Amino acid sequence: MCAAEARPARVAMLGGTFDPVHMGHLRSAVELREALELDRVHMVPARVPPHRATPGVSAERRAALLALGIGDTPGLAVDDREIARDGPSYSADTLASLREELGPQARLVMALGHDAYLNLAEWHEPQRLFDLAHIVVIDRPDHDRPLAPALQELVAGREVSDVETLMQAPAGSLLALRLPTRMAISATSIRERLRRGDSIRYLVPEAVERDLLARGLYA
């Protein structure tokens, strides 16, 4: 067996409301896959996000828009397991489901933005997240907020400085990763533009724009 065949699978979960999906989400997923040399990035729309208001557009429609946005992009996939599951969309449960599918040796990563990371200690079963996966924080050059004591305690001794070290084990470590492209695009601003009737051209993929306008979503 050659070395490439022997390498454990590398898979990331990138969750969110995707309300709606935009170029920032998709570019981050592509660059995350490249930086970590991942086999797949599972983009997981939340049905009932635990830490924010439930979106006004259904989870099924948000997932359909996400599929339009991904198109035929290699290595990116819509994962609807949180939509199929009743109750709050807890990341720990999603990671447990992925871990069961992938097996104990797969390198499983949960990627999240820096703002979400600052509240990680308040998430459902935060310790279990590290039992199941690595956490990669998509870093921001302008962040300067100190970590809360509970978060410092949660991540103590887990930080690694490079991808090679991260991938030596199936789970349990924390890596801050600065991606090459940081787009100042927010789903909130896109929803506001749609309500005003302003253009969202080049903020979302063309297929997503067509579907949003045809259905009058967020208008």
UniProtKB/Swiss-Prot annotation:
SUPFAM superfamilies: Nucleotidylyl transferase. Its EC number is 2.7.7.18. CDD domains: NMNAT. It catalyses: nicotinate beta-D-ribonucleotide + ATP + H(+) = deamido-NAD(+) + diphosphate. One of its GO terms (molecular function) is ATP binding. GO terms for biological process: NAD biosynthetic process. Pathway: Cofactor biosynthesis; NAD(+) biosynthesis; deamido-NAD(+) from nicotinate D-ribonucleotide: step 1/1. It is an enzyme of class 2 (transferase). It comes from the Bacteria. Keywords: ATP-binding, NAD, Nucleotide-binding, Nucleotidyltransferase, Pyridine nucleotide biosynthesis, Transferase. Catalyzes the reversible adenylation of nicotinate mononucleotide (NaMN) to nicotinic acid adenine dinucleotide (NaAD). Belongs to the NadD family. This is Probable nicotinate-nucleotide adenylyltransferase. It comes from Chromohalobacter salexigens (strain ATCC BAA-138 / DSM 3043 / CIP 106854 / NCIMB 13768 / 1H11).
